[in-house]
Amino acid sequence: MLSLRLFLPDIWTADPARLNRAGVPLEHQGSRTKPEMAIEEIDRLCAAGVRFGCVLADAGYGLSAPFRQALSARGLRWAVGIPRHQKVYSTDVELVFPARKRGPSRMHPVPDQQSVPAHKILETATWRRVSWRRGTKGGLAARFAAMRIRVADGPAQRIGGRTAQHMPGEEAWLIGEHRSTGERKYYLSNLSADSSLRLLAAAIKARWVCEQAHQQLKEELGLDHFEGRSWTGLHRHALMSMMAYAFLQSRRLTAVGRKKKSHRPTTTAQSASNTTGHS
């Protein structure tokens, strides 16, 4: 756990007196969305030399086109949840200048197909059972489907008499997950086009570790137990919770290392003096 940021809703940022009573610093009193704050933290961590493989986020962040685009602009790999109605195009979409019967020709090209919801385009996809890792009770598996698409997150454009739709944006993976409970989840990822379905599933499900860390911080290490109304007090409390988590995690990793060492097979080498040779 490297970073935590406090999100202040509009009811707070619109009340300067309330912010001042709580001791919120001026630079944090402005209104910010959660995706904006996440990008700020990622920039701060990258500037500090932190390296990571893939940015993971739930649909609360994944539905934000500026968030996804900011990650791609920074050269980062990402895998994020999205709502089922997120619009996408097939990869063969083209931009054309449709002929008009009357009036001047169009100044801007438009897509030659309509965008469709994510869940619709995956209806014809092949779903396969994939195991992404082993758990305490065996392999963790679900049914997945994936296809390359263009995300409909470009500028909005009115096409003909229809309502405006977003232009094709970045090419990415659209992934669907069909859980044993019947629930379906949808994701986008900019992992490389040659990524296997198992790799995509493993990247998506790695977010479980983050969720477990948050749960442990809140329930076992007291992050949720702060009852004050001071910016400084809250941040001191959060820092202590994070330090406790870092300590426990280091102990956990040390114990795992010892366990692996103790299970390592030992080999006995026969000494040269006991080896029978030929003259």
Question: What is each residue range found by the language model?
Answer:
Residues 85-90:
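Short gly/pro/ser/thr-enriched loop/turn and capping motifs at secondary-structure boundaries
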Residues 181-208:
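Extended, non-catalytic structural segments that build the interaction scaffolds
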